[in-house]
């Protein structure tokens, strides 16, 4: 078994190397610019097969993401060793409210919609302002960072009665980390829930003629019901419907890009634009219009879709609904890879439609939101009706994340005060003040607060991966699978902390030296802590 796991691991590395080599040798070739129906640039090809480098890269990226699940995902599964004989929290602690066995497909959809939000769309579109290097980060980060983070954090929660992230961090990083993470996670989750109500409301208002405040109240009303009712009552029934909008959005954009090189062979009624997919393949230069440093800012901008600490706050929700431990990889790892594919498609779509990061930067400059760029892409490629369907998908993603966030916040508060949540009155005791705070916060200006959302997100991911490293070290298993991405993300958040003008404002070089030294110290401390923990940490449920 160990030999097969090792071979699968090196096979995954080989795939990554091939992917990197093809990216390096792909030549940069651009076509002439035409005006799309909305006046945005669309790149014409001299013929249907005149330049297939970008098209091949696009297909290859999606295939590598899928292959990463079936190869590296199996390696992670062998490292963790799921046990079919162990009872899961849903079976051992069933209460009909939060601990409920649900079909795997339904749990997968809820997990996907809970973690996705606007990150794999807005974050991916804004991330490609740094150039095609963003596509490399999505693929490599999703497989070797995001899937590791989501699978292990979800499975550790599963082994500990569906514990929330603060309890997991406290168990492996210490009691101080537990209390700090409780405060951070609760505040962080409330902010995410509020923004994922205000954001969709701002999109829906001009589409319907209703005011933004009216939509905020409607969305909060749905959030409240989804937070207090049994998980299968609303989320278990509504999410399959939400997933239809998500599928239409992804399949629509993906279909246009796959058929674009063959547009002249397509029926007229399909309205497939003739364009060059990914005309700009300059992977190794920072292209950001404002000259923001690619490292670390790009790795903070693209969080969801690559690796995101926010996911670890959501996984315990579904860890309480799995029937067997074998369902962990398709639910936690599979949802992460699916989100990575969504992010990759939207990042590639933005580069294809606008042609260059500079053109995309002009379209999103002067306060123009990425939602405008997304609407232009969808309307140009899919027409007015298709644009509406895509924008509905864009609205559904944050709403389906916001309800899960606030439900998890209720559970985290319940864990803090040891409040049993079987009775409705106990749930209302937490939910009413929680939503009162959320409504009060919804009127605040997020222009400054949201700048640090991505940084806090990656800080949470780094802490989670260090906790996973300690867990694996305590079991004498391959802790490097988590320690390496933990070290990288720690370097990202520390470099941003030291070098960002909004934070410490040190010189880039001095910040990098300090960050590397601190990461080395953190890594040594975590590995020593892991070797000192006893192995018998997982009670039979």
Protein language model regions, located:
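Membrane-helix boundary/coupling elements in multi-pass transport proteins
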Residues: 119-125, 161, 188-201, 300-322, ...
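Loop-to-transmembrane helix boundary motifs in multi-pass membrane proteins
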Residues: 175-179, 186, 216, 334-343, ...
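Extracellular loop-to-transmembrane helix junctions
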Residues: 53-73, 127-157, 166, 511-519
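Hydrophobic alpha-helical segments and their helix-loop junctions in multi-pass secondary transporters
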Residues: 193-217, 225-227, 246-284, 469-479, ...
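Membrane-interface "cap" regions at the ends of multi-pass membrane proteins
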Residues: 64-121, 327
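Extracellular/periplasmic helix-exit of transmembrane alpha-helices
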Residues: 258-280, 334-376
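Helix-loop-helix module between adjacent transmembrane segments
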Residues: 64-65, 69, 111, 145-161, ...
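Helix-loop-helix connectors at the membrane interface of multi-pass transporters/channels
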Residues: 162-176, 199-215, 315-340, 373-376, ...
